[in-house]
């Protein structure tokens, strides 16, 4: 694959360490897509509310992206002496090249564009922290990623022009900041909610898949998911949030019998053409950070 230039600075990071974190990113993507049943999302059972993609597309996409994750880590390390606000500019060509390989692997299907952005940021943050010999925890990784994105929401969502992007339109209509806003804030939905929730369930001895499904419900209940809003408007988003919250209030996903509730929720999401892709992206980050 053709690699864009990154930096003339050298990194002291061992290749084995870089590959270890890249492997975790790949495993995080596979863990999310294979998790079943997921309301409105592609999984091992069906294609959710998607008519243009299948499970195999996500497997091919994750493999293509895995080859680029070391580059994000390396750039984070090589740019460690740069001001954090300058890092995002250098990450963009790597992200675009990674995106190109994703589209080639899936014959044009957008499977993981959001994950390229979020995992790319976290991998770059990991590289920076390792290079600077600073503490590497979920919180420091996310706060470092946030420092890369300072001002991003203002620059890309609050700009008024005649050709509004989907993200700008949702921001102006519903004040949803999506993936950009979550990144700039340091992923609070993950750090303050999803990750502690998931780890608590694991500590209680809950099956890891059930714990992840329950954590997905939590994210769906609290996330202003632009994927859902773009398909179903504000009404669709509020409906999905209410349904997820209701399931959590009834006890969530604790046993195999509880999966029937998710299957019904899945059918309703498919009927309404709603897919909580933004929450799925955050679930990928939750699992990834839980391994650090």
Curated annotation (Swiss-Prot):
Keywords: ATP-binding, Nucleotide-binding, Transferase. It catalyses: 3'-dephospho-CoA + ATP = 2'-(5''-triphospho-alpha-D-ribosyl)-3'-dephospho-CoA + adenine. The keyword Methyltransferase does not apply. GO terms for molecular function: ATP binding; triphosphoribosyl-dephospho-CoA synthase activity. It holds the Pfam family CitG. Its EC number is 2.4.2.52. Belongs to the CitG/MdcB family. PANTHER family: 2-(5''-TRIPHOSPHORIBOSYL)-3'-DEPHOSPHOCOENZYME-A SYNTHASE (PTHR30201:SF2), TRIPHOSPHORIBOSYL-DEPHOSPHO-COA SYNTHASE (PTHR30201). This is Probable 2-(5''-triphosphoribosyl)-3'-dephosphocoenzyme-A synthase. NCBIfam families: citrate_citG, PRK10096.1. One of its GO terms (biological process) is prosthetic group biosynthetic process. It comes from the Bacteria. InterPro entries: CitG (IPR002736), TriPribosyl-deP-CoA_syn_CitG (IPR017551).
């Amino acid at each position: 694959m053709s690699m864009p230039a990154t930096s003339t600075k050298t990194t002291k990071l061992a290749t084995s360490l870089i590959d270890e974190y890249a492997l975790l990113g790949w495993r995080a993507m596979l863990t999310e897509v294979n998790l079943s049943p997921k309301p409105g999302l592609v999984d091992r059972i069906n294609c959710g509310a998607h008519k243009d993609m299948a499970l195999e597309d996500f497997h091919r996409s994750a493999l293509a992206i895995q080859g680029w994750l070391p580059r994000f880590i390396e750039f984070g390390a090589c740019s460690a002496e740069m001001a954090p606000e300058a890092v995002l500019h250098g990450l963009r060509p790597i992200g675009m090249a990674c995106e190109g390989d994703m589209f080639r692997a899936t014959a044009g299907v957008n499977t993981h564009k959001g994950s390229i952005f979020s995992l790319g940021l976290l991998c770059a943050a990991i590289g920076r922290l390792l290079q600077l010999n600073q503490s590497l925890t979920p919180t420091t990784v996310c706060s470092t990623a946030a420092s890369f994105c300072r001002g991003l929401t203002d620059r890309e969502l609050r700009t008024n022009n005649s050709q509004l992007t989907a993200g700008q339109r949702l921001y102006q209509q519903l004040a949803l900041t999506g993936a950009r806003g979550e990144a700039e804030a340091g992923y609070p939905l993950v750090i303050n909610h999803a990750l502690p929730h998931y780890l608590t369930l694991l500590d209680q001895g809950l099956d890891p898949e059930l714990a992840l499904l329950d954590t997905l419900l939590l994210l769906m209940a609290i996330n202003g998911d632009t994927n859902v809003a773009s398909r179903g408007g504000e009404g669709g988003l509020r409906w999905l949030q209410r349904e997820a919250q209701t399931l959590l209030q009834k006890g969530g996903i604790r046993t195999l019998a509880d999966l029937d509730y998710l299957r019904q929720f899945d059918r309703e999401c498919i009927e309404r053409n709603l897919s909580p892709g933004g929450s799925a992206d955050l679930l990928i980050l939750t699992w990834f950070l839980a391994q650090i």
